[in-house]
UniProtKB/Swiss-Prot annotation:
Probable component of the nuclear pore complex (NPC). It is a peripheral membrane protein. It comes from Xenopus tropicalis (Western clawed frog). A zinc finger (C3H1-type) spans 1-25. This is Nucleoporin NUP42. The gene is nup42.
Length: 449
């Protein structure tokens, strides 16, 4: 370990915490002690006693506040030369002897931490511009000196994906030179801004300081703010107006409806997709204003064939308020087939197969074709027979009689339609894994407790 030269001179301020060696033996120690020890004669004249001896303390033995207590004590004209050196040192620094000699350095550090020097800001910005220009980094990006500061103006922020998208848009337009000119223009603006920041004059420095000190006001929200297009004009037909609850709707606009050539209808009339208020009778047999009770899947009162028949939401006649009543006129139930003269039940019951129909009646989901003339179904176009027997057309185009409705969509399967393996599985107490039948069980094998 090296010997501390300041300790040999008697002015090491670290004391025992010094990282160099302080020798403690031989003549060095004697000289060190003798240096801080006043002559007995001077002490006698000063303190009035020959037994008293004033020893000048070393610099590292002072208090942490570096207050010179020597000025509080009486001193003689023949005092030690060390104190004269101390006074001479403090006078050269320009601070009183009671002040810390290192206070100037600490105050400068605190002031630099409290407020950033403007000269350092200019040096940092100039250095960053030189590095940015020579490093070959991405040009089309913003720059900010500090995280708390706003971005310096004059730089464009475009990602490679945005440039690629703009190139594809210009290529689709058949004008790739537009993309090339735009990129070259952005590159020239970037180089010009770099050159301006590297060579700042006093007026531009003042403008830059004002820009950095002003609060940021050009920041917009990522979801609600309007984003500027990359090259002055957006390639996509966007609407800058944010949608509100009043404008949000699934309803098609008038332009799309005009292009379609017809209104949205289920039964061929002017009925919306999910029903509308009937003109002659409401859905549940009560009049009044349009309420939740008027919501219906039924078509309006005017049918496809010009007949003035009134419909009801659940198959009852429109002249009564019940869900099952006698119909004075031909009523079309919502989910059943057409009936001639009997009452229509809730879901299409009470069929008559022998009545002659004067007008064609059409329900919502299945086309009941009765009477002369062609009848258009919702899904299948069929031609009705010219005889007086009512028939119905299913969704798959197969004609069947109303009396045979429960033969195909039955809840139970007859035993003669099951295979021996399926019948054995139904008769067993538990199904075998991998052999469970997919058909409904027979009614006579069900054991309801």
């Amino acid at each position: 370990m090296a010997i501390c030269s300041f300790f040999l001179q008697g002015r090491c301020r670290y004391g025992e915490k010094c990282w160099n060696e302080h020798p403690r033996g031989g003549s060095s120690r004697y000289q060190s002690q003798n240096r801080y020890q006043e002559p007995p004669g001077n002490a006698k004249g000063t303190w009035g006693s020959s037994s008293q001896r004033y020893v000048q303390p070393s610099s590292f033995s002072r208090s942490t506040t570096w207050v010179n207590r020597d000025n509080e004590k009486p001193s003689s004209g023949s005092h030690s030369g060390f104190d004269n050196r101390n006074v001479k040192f403090t006078a050269a620094t320009g601070f009183p002897s009671s002040q810390n000699r290192f206070a100037a350095l600490s105050s400068q550090d605190n002031s630099r931490d409290a407020q950033t020097d403007k000269g350092n800001i200019i040096d940092d910005i100039t250095n960053d511009m030189e590095i940015w220009e020579s490093s070959g980094q991405w040009m089309f990006s913003v720059y900010s000196m500090l995280r708390e500061k706003k971005n310096i103006s004059g730089f464009a922020d475009f990602s490679p994906e945005e440039l690629r998208l703009e190139y594809y848009a210009c290529q689709a337009e058949g004008n790739p030179l537009k993309y090339i000119n735009a990129v070259q223009q952005l590159g020239s603006k970037w180089k010009q801004r770099i050159l301006e920041l590297k060579n700042l004059n006093p007026s531009s420095k003042m403008a830059l300081f004002n820009e950095l000190s002003s609060p940021s006001s050009d920041m917009t929200s990522g979801y609600n703010g309007q984003q500027k297009p990359a090259f002055g004009s957006s390639s996509f037909p966007t609407n800058n107006t944010a949608p509100t609850a009043a404008t949000f709707s699934f309803k098609a606009d008038a332009a799309n409806a005009a292009k379609a050539g017809a209104t949205n209808s289920l039964a061929g009339s002017n009925v919306p997709a999910f029903g509308n208020k009937p003109t002659s009778a409401p859905s549940f047999g009560s009049g009044g204003a349009a309420t939740a009770a008027s919501f219906s899947f039924a078509p309006s009162s005017s049918s496809n064939f010009g007949a003035t028949t009134s419909t009801s939401g659940f198959g009852n006649a429109s002249n009564t308020a019940s869900f099952q009543g006698t119909a004075n006129s031909a009523a079309a139930p919502a989910f059943g087939v057409a009936s001639s003269s009997t009452a229509a039940t809730g879901f299409g019951g009470g069929f008559s197969t022998t009545g002659a129909m004067n007008t064609g009646v059409r329900d919502l989901f299945s086309a009941g074709t009765v009477g002369p003339g062609p009848v258009t179904s919702l899904f299948v176009q069929t031609t009705g027979p010219l005889h007086a027997t009512a028939s119905s057309t299913s969704l798959d185009g197969q004609s069947f009689r109303p009396s045979a409705l429960n033969t195909t969509n039955s809840l139970f399967t007859p035993q003669n339609e099951l295979s021996a393996e399926e019948l054995a599985q139904f008769k067993a107490q538990r199904f075998t894994l991998g052999k469970i039948p997919l058909k409904p069980p027979p009614a006579d094998l069900l054991n309801v407790s």
